[in-house]
Regions:
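Catalytic histidine neighborhood in serine/cysteine hydrolases
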Residues: 172-191
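N-terminal cap/lid segment of alpha/beta-hydrolase-fold proteins
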Residues: 1-23
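Short beta-strand/loop motif that positions the catalytic acidic residue
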Residues: 145, 150-153, 157
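Alpha/beta-hydrolase active-site loop
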Residues: 75-96
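Acidic catalytic loop of the alpha/beta-hydrolase fold
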Residues: 155-160, 190-191
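Gly/Ala-rich beta-loop-alpha elbow adjacent to hydrolase catalytic centers
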Residues: 106-114
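Short, surface-exposed "cap/lid" segments of acyl-processing enzymes
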Residues: 21-62
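Alpha/beta-hydrolase fold nucleophile elbow
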Residues: 96-107
Length: 229
């Protein structure tokens, strides 16, 4: 698990990178929760997401947003953090020029940043969005959502009420050409205390289905966009 440093618009950004042995392996970027509420790339959910992708032969990167850990800069209320995520994807693509696809995964604040990056980077073909803060941030930029993905949350989330996430999912489900799947973890709060195993089981089930459905993530997404599946 090499420690890496790459350059963002606010200076150096620290990360952890797992390279796949396959030159054409897909890329995954994992984004951590809110920097001002203890979010770092070493958060347990971020850490486990990282290994879910690594164990499926992705080249995967997690990193600290600006102002967190050894990453330079200061919290920028989302705009700068989106730039950090774009820089992370640029870095990963620069050392994986033959990558056959790209996924984005994020938890809470990181889910919001990840969905914004999804809109700006058409090469992102799949996403995992955990506890997206639909009541705290504007998600109307997802018009339309360009890729299929998974939204997962707990039904006892007091930070982001169940109804707000479900409302977001229902809006996205009306769009043609993509498939948005929703998973609800029973009795789970916003941080999935005591429920991380169930959370990861849902993530693994979805990701494996996407990979196996088309031989690799990219071909599965193409099938969904063309109306297959």
């Amino acid at each position: 698990m090499p420690e890496i440093i790459f350059t963002g618009s606010a200076g150096r950004i620290e990360g952890r990178y797992h390279p796949s042995r396959a030159k054409n392996a897909p890329i995954a970027i994992v984004l951590h929760p809110h920097p001002q509420f203890g979010g770092t790339m070493n958060h347990p959910i971020v850490y486990q997401l990282y290994y879910v992708f690594a164990n499926r032969n992705f080249s995967v990167l997690r990193f600290n947003f600006r102002g967190v850990g050894r990453s330079q800069g200061a919290f920028d209320h989302g705009q700068g953090e989106l730039a950090d995520a774009a820089s992370a994807l640029d870095w990963a693509q620069s050392i994986n020029p033959e990558a056959r696809g790209c996924w984005i995964a994020g938890f809470s604040f990181g889910a919001w940043i990840g969905m914004q990056l999804l809109m700006r980077r058409p090469e992102i073909e799949g996403f995992i969005s955990i506890a997206p803060p639909a009541n705290l941030y504007d998600f109307s930029f997802l018009a339309p959502c360009p890729s299929s993905g998974l939204i997962i949350h707990g039904d006892k989330d007091a930070v982001v009420p169940h109804k707000d996430v479900t409302g977001l999912v229902e809006k996205l489900k009306t769009q043609k050409g993509i498939t948005i799947e929703q998973r609800i973890v029973p009795a789970a709060n916003h941080f999935f205390d005591g429920k991380i195993d169930q959370l990861m089981a849902a993530v693994v089930g979805y990701l494996d289905k996407r990979i196996e459905g088309g031989g690799d993530p990219k071909s599965e997404t193409r099938g969904r966009r063309s109306g297959a599946g």
